[in-house]
């Protein structure tokens, strides 16, 4: 059986010099599944599972990065995730990897306990959330992205029909660059309040009647939906820039209706 010589020093190959002199903008680990807890708007802690991407800039003269340090960072980051905690993780990663620039991104399911509009029955609804941060040239930028399922009802269908109108489930995706802490629930509310109607996980018959009539009284094209959400984001000082998308999974077509608005308030006229 081979035994390692106590005097033997294992070579650190990735720290050797690379003679090709080509920098790598982003190198790290991708699609790492790891449990985490998230601090909710009410202050509660919600357990979930995140899919993490972590990477750093690699100088031209360095052969490789230290891949194990990315996972070690996740293992040691057990505190509930907040925007400020995420910022601290990003700074810690740069120190650990001795890097001048880097990025962390995590996507996870986030659950909100919702109360049905008439019966009051409670149920959970899931949302896809992504928190991302990047640091470069001493500047750190943080991004919060939420995918919110809603209901949309077609104004044209309502106008031309003697009764009824076609409606469908839609996705509103808000990818916001943050100037200050912004709860996930705040972005969810903006999307839901500007849709024809929001969704619930569990509805009784009186609730279903409410949802049907609410959507009928509040018809919106996909263009209306993105413009109304954009107005809300424009008025929120916690958001400095955003990419906003809406996709209607049309119930009378085998394709979707789609709209996008992108705006950086720092460069707005």
Swiss-Prot record:
Q: Where is this site: May be catalytically important?
A: 154
EC number(s) for this protein?
A: 3.5.4.16
Q: Which Gene3D superfamilies match?
A: Urate Oxidase
Q: Name one GO molecular function term.
A: GTP cyclohydrolase I activity
> Which Gene Ontology terms describe the biological processes this protein takes part in?
tetrahydrofolate biosynthetic process
Keyword list (alphabetical) reads: Hydrolase
Q: Main EC class of this protein? A: hydrolase
Q: In which pathway does it act?
A: Cofactor biosynthesis; 7,8-dihydroneopterin triphosphate biosynthesis; 7,8-dihydroneopterin triphosphate from GTP: step 1/1
Any Pfam family the entry gives: GCHY-1
Q: Which InterPro entries match?
A: GTP_cyclohydrolase_FolE2, GTP_cyclohydrolase_FolE2/MptA
- Which transformation does this protein catalyse, written as a reaction? GTP + H2O = 7,8-dihydroneopterin 3'-triphosphate + formate + H(+)
Keyword Hydrolase among UniProt keywords: yes
Please give the family membership noted in the entry: Belongs to the GTP cyclohydrolase IV family.
**PANTHER family, alphabetized:** GTP CYCLOHYDROLASE MPTA (PTHR36445:SF1)
Purpose of the protein? Converts GTP to 7,8-dihydroneopterin triphosphate.
Q: What is this protein called?
A: GTP cyclohydrolase FolE2
Q: Which organism is it from?
A: Burkholderia ambifaria (strain MC40-6)
- Recite the lineage of the species: Bacteria, Pseudomonadati, Pseudomonadota, Betaproteobacteria, Burkholderiales
Originating gene: folE2
């Amino acid at each position: 059986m081979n035994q390692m010589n106590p005097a033997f020093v294992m070579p650190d190959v990735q720290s050797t010099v690379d003679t090709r002199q080509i920098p790598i903008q982003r190198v790290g680990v991708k699609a790492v599944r790891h449990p985490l807890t998230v601090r909710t708007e009410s202050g509660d802690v919600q357990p979930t599972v995140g899919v993490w991407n972590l990477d750093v800039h690699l100088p031209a003269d360095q052969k490789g990065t230290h891949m194990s340090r990315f996972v070690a960072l996740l293992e040691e980051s057990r505190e509930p995730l907040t925007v400020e905690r995420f910022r601290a993780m990003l700074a810690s990663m740069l120190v650990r990897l001795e890097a001048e620039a880097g990025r962390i991104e995590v996507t996870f399911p986030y659950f909100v306990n919702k109360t049905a509009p008439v019966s009051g029955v409670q149920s959970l609804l899931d949302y896809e959330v992504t928190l991302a941060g990047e640091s470069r040239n001493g500047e750190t930028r943080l991004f919060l992205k939420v995918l919110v399922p809603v209901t949309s009802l077609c104004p044209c269908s309502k106008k031309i029909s003697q009764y009824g109108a076609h409606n469908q489930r839609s996705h509103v995706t808000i990818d916001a660059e943050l100037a200050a802490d912004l709860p996930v629930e705040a972005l969810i509310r903006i999307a839901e309040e500007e849709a024809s109607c929001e969704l619930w996980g569990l509805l009784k018959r009186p609730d279903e009647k409410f949802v049907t009539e609410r959507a009928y009284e509040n018809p919106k094209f996909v263009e209306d939906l993105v413009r109304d959400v954009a107005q809300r984001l424009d008025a929120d000082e916690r958001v400095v820039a955003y990419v906003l998308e809406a996709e209607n999974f049309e119930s009378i077509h085998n394709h979707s209706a789609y709209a996008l608005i992108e705006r950086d308030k720092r460069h707005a006229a």
